[in-house]
Amino acid sequence: MKQVFISQHPLVHHKLTLLRRATTEPKKFRELVSELSQFLLYEATLDLPLQERAIDTPLAPYHGHQIAERIGLVPILRAGLGMVDPILDLIPTAHVWHLGLYRDHATLQPVTYYNKLPPEVDVDLCLVLDPMLATGGSAVAAVSILKEWGASRIKFLGLIAAPEGVRALHEAHPNVPIHLAALDDHLNDRGYIVPGLGDAGDRLFGTG
């Protein structure tokens, strides 16, 4: 799939192994999610347009550049929250809007319970954030909500995905790039990614 980008960075592979480990404590887990999120952001923003900006250094005038687009972050609650702060560290001017979606454990279908989008679109690029792309239901629903809202450019950033989730998101929204740290083997009968890392939300917030 042309729109699927899986990181090949050695540090991503290293940190992802630590993240997956069952004995990794919540504090370390959060740190690793933060670090991996910044690696993914770097790769997902390589095509950001720039505009010229004139500044003064302590020694002389300088003609530099700044990001030309307004960026919005859309974390899918609750696990997506773990990816917000590290991205804001790099793009502090980004707007943040929350979408609450949970997966019904009986049907494995997404249910929307919270939507904090403003009345009108005021960004050029939306980054949907969710550590896990399992069935793809929540990601598909989130992107659909953003498109109905009027967002024109959308990218998905996730740490680990199952082929089923990637396929579902790509088929529903083929124009949305998918940036991942890893693509795993399959989903089990409970809808969990295998080998995966378990429930990202529980591990982030110590509720498992």
UniProtKB/Swiss-Prot annotation:
Alphabetical list of SUPFAM superfamilies matching this protein: PRTase-like
Catalytic activity: UMP + diphosphate = 5-phospho-alpha-D-ribose 1-diphosphate + uracil
Sites where the protein binds 5-phospho-alpha-D-ribose 1-diphosphate: 78, 103, 130-138, 199
Activity regulation, free text: Allosterically activated by GTP.
Domain of life of the native organism: Bacteria
Entry note: cofactor: Binds 1 Mg(2+) ion per subunit. The magnesium is bound as Mg-PRPP.
Cofactor: Mg(2+)
CDD domains xrefs: PRTases_typeI
Enzyme class: transferase
InterPro entries in the cross-refs: PRibTrfase_dom, PRTase-like, Upp_B, UPRTase/APRTase, Ura_phspho_trans
Residues involved in uracil binding: 193, 198-200
Similarity comment: family membership: Belongs to the UPRTase family.
Annotated protein name in UniProt: Uracil phosphoribosyltransferase
Native source species: Roseiflexus castenholzii (strain DSM 13941 / HLO8)
Gene symbol of the encoding locus: upp
